[in-house]
Amino acid sequence: MSSREIRIATRKSALALWQAEYVKARLEAAHPGLLVTLVPMVSRGDKLLDSPLSKIGGKGLFVKELETALLENEADIAVHSMKDVPMDFPEGLGLFCICEREDPRDAFVSNTYSSLDALPAGSIVGTSSLRRQAQLLTRRPDLEIRFLRGNVNTRLAKLDAGEYDAIILAAAGLIRLGFEDRITSAISVDDSLPAGGQGAVGIECRSADTEIHALLAPLHHADTADRVTAERALNKHLNGGCQVPIACYAVLEGDQLWLRGLVGEPSGGKLLNAQARAPRAAAETLGVQVAEDLLSQGADDILKAVYGEAGHE
């Protein structure tokens, strides 16, 4: 193995590069002598920063270019934020490793106010996520939600410039980039259910490349993988991409998985909730079960309306 090289396809954002460097360090620690190099590239989602993610659409906005690199043998693995990974993979590719999850919660960031509850009526809150928006406006319909895109540094700079009273970001990204001190308060999953896979890093590679699969095995975290499998099964059954108002979060209780799911109107008008428990071996079935519960409550109507507004499927 000492002469083997692994090329990692990654986006060029600071967070994506952190994740790729993390995987590189883990691989080098597990396999001394292994040569690991990064192949940075720009995704469509990185280029289109002037529109809400829900408008420019679709699934795989941040991964397609990386998958092309794998298919054309320009890279051996691709490192992704699991919340950005589509449910289906191109023929010949698959997800072969999920690393241990960082804090999956959303983070409240403000220079003035201590928490969501402390925000006065009419406060301006920045987020690009319909999932966060739906839950936030259900809880606080007196707030004004404004579009916020860009990398973590850009978003923090906009807050510091006074464009927003507060912004909502994934806690994991702030922690990984050394901005943990900017987290004013972590938002309980009871108040803002995370996106499926939030806080987890996944590794995609060619399905036939068994040598790479073996090298990745020490990085795989079974507890995280089972939780994320249930979350992704819910998302897939709802035909959800990463830019729709779907939230889902699974926790392990011994050998049982507890999965909570949510679909909400971006306006905060309606929020549907469902939950169930099952053995961890039945993670996919559990995801489908909770998704079916949401569909029986009318989730499909909410999601069709969102897709119609975005102009894509």
Curated annotation (Swiss-Prot):
Q: What InterPro entries does the database record attribute to this sequence?
A: HemC, Porphobilin_deaminase_cofac_BS, Porphobilin_deaminase_N, Porphobilinogen_deaminase_C, Porphobilinogen_deaminase_C_sf
Q: What's one GO BP annotation on this UniProt entry?
A: protoporphyrinogen IX biosynthetic process
Q: In which pathway does it act?
A: Porphyrin-containing compound metabolism; protoporphyrin-IX biosynthesis; coproporphyrinogen-III from 5-aminolevulinate: step 2/4
Single GO MF descriptor: hydroxymethylbilane synthase activity
Q: What class of enzyme is it?
A: transferase
What does the record note about the cofactor? Answer: Binds 1 dipyrromethane group covalently.
Which E.C. number(s) belong to this protein? 2.5.1.61
Q: Spell out the Gene3D superfamilies in the cross-references.
A: Periplasmic binding protein-like II (3.40.190.10), Porphobilinogen deaminase, C-terminal domain (3.30.160.40)
Q: Which Pfam families match?
A: Porphobil_deam, Porphobil_deamC
Any idea which UniProt keywords this protein has?
A: Porphyrin biosynthesis, Transferase
**Which reactions is this enzyme annotated as catalysing?**
4 porphobilinogen + H2O = hydroxymethylbilane + 4 NH4(+)
The source's domain of life comes to: Bacteria
Q: Does the keyword Transferase apply?
A: yes
CC per GO annotation: cytoplasm
Q: Which cofactor does it need?
A: dipyrromethane
Sites of S-(dipyrrolylmethanemethyl)cysteine modification: 242
Kindly state the subunit structure of this protein: Monomer.
What biological function has been recorded for the protein in this entry?
Answer: Tetrapolymerization of the monopyrrole PBG into the hydroxymethylbilane pre-uroporphyrinogen in several discrete steps.
Task: Please report which protein family the annotation says this sequence is part of.
Answer: Belongs to the HMBS family.
- What additional remark is attached to this entry? The porphobilinogen subunits are added to the dipyrromethane group.
Q: Could you identify this protein by its name?
A: Porphobilinogen deaminase
